[in-house]
């Protein structure tokens, strides 16, 4: 590998690490605020938003492990093994998020829970919409440049966080304006197809990676 290529790999890895460190820091803060405000407001989408932030922390930690375990000078086999494990971690977090949202949203619909209007939820979703798309795009671009399917998959989870921000804003906003108690859980459930599909796609990529390693 040429010196220029090595320096580029080092720079890309450094950028990826900083993106994941930022993801962890932002989502830890977001989770505390969202879950706390959601419990006070009785908001399924807001709590689910906070749990999603926590789950995204797990995904980001998995990517940090992958990046630190297999650096720019790692052997091909070592990098491949780390990439495969990171893909499985990201896939698991997608399914974990889908299961949680399903449980909480259906429970809210069956019990006809009416959340209080949550200004915190609206502000939080707006802030997240301002940050998450840019973060997701940066991860996606870096992952493709590195040839890391795990980082690209993690960027998709960050995109899901953006979608949930929009769903949260719609759900809480409709309740505040029109009093539609069901808008909150429906907004959360509307994200399920995207989340499950991305989880399945990531799991498929992990299996393909596994098969390639054993070919």
Kindly label every feature range from the protein language model.
Residues 1-215:
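Alpha-helical transmembrane cores and adjacent cytosolic helix/loop segments
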